[in-house]
Amino acid sequence: MSLDGFVAGPDQSVDNPIGVGGMRLHEWVFPLRAWNAMHGQEGGEVNESNRIVEESFANLGATIMGRNMFGGQPGGWKKGTPKKGKPWNGWWGDDPPYHHPVFVLTHHPREPLALKGGTTFNFVTDGIESALAQARRAAGKKDVAVAGGASVARQFLAAGLVDQMEINLVPILLGAGERLFDGVGADLHGLEIVSTVATPRVTHFKFANS
């Protein structure tokens, strides 16, 4: 998240899913060994940020995300992309970094999409409570992550369904885009700081909902 509260830049599109300037919010994670390992690559930086990313993903058994985070393209599911003419399976390629079941909130039904590495995208049309129940069953004794985007995160926060929240605060100003907390400030209270880790490129906050 930027210092002015944005988690995506303006003018999000199929070609630019996190908006103008949005990639700057994630530049800290790309050199990390943990990020490379999730994408089947070797090497990378080992530092405090790497430790936090490893810990965040170590006990995940399922992830929830919105339609836009899966692959944009509002409306009914298209058969392919304008550029490649292939079936549209989202932004994540043939071997996504999740390696566990993912539940995608959408208004448009679709059969589950099984890809390499253990990732299966399941499409949920009956709301956040249903997505959470399905994700909990799939995760078993492991944790469930609400990955985003901002709209989905706001729904879970407003409903009081978030036990812990992690924010990676990047020292930049975007000036415009999509804010995480728009419209949920009055509903969000009782947060406690669990940990704070500052690095030159990002500060990692973990909150618990009391």
Language-model features, listed with the residues they occupy:
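Enzymes that bind and transform nitrogen-containing heteroaromatic metabolites
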Residues: 1-210
